Amino acid sequence: MTGTAQPNKDLSLSIKDPNDTIVRFDILPIDESGEIKYEFPYTQSFIEGTYVLTATQDDITQVSLFTLGTDSYDRVVVYLEKMNFFANSKASVSVLGPPSTEFTLDILDYGDNKKFSTLVKTNSVGSTTFVVDLTGYSSGVYKAVASNPLYQDTAKFSVGLSSGSGNITFSSTKLQYSGGDNILIIGNAGANSILNISLIDPNGETVTKFEIFTDKEGTFSTDMLGIPSNAMDGEWQIKAQSGLDHKEVIITVS
């Protein structure tokens, strides 16, 4: 992968296989040039199909598709450049999939009531972006759904949420990891709150940091964390914070 990013800031990269399993996670240092150059080993364990590469820097995310063993995309991915939006702002929703293909793009509220719907069509390289006006959207969690008779994908986002969640509890699905492993965390906090999730190495350096949100029941989960492939052994820390409220979980990398 080649491209550009903000200079002098680390870039988080994850790769999902056709079964939506994260098979690779890396932290890529970006120097003053802002240039991205990334390679990963392609082994026989990789199955044929369409893979999803997600790059995150600060709270901005970009997604791209690539194929192994086939020449065409056989899935759709919908994503937003970030997860949390101010009230009365605008959200850019991107759809990736087979080239020159029509999809219905729906915006649904938490009760699956349709707030907005339109038809979009991918361009010759399989992408399109639509700007949704969030004026009049009440505070809460929403879903962007891209679909046609063959494919469907969903991305959640929030509008008008604030920090300060009250008590936070969460856990990771396991406590022992190796370099390149994906981390899934699941937890609870105050309803409709923004959380900052951080991964901290044994030297106290923050390796990854991003925002997520709780739903109206106060639950949250994310698989956007991962151990860098060249990670040092030792005790790492996962931290969830919302305003003055915070919770830490210790994991071991070996």
Which residues fall in each region the model found?
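Ser/Thr-rich low-complexity repeats and stalk/linker segments
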Residues: 1-254
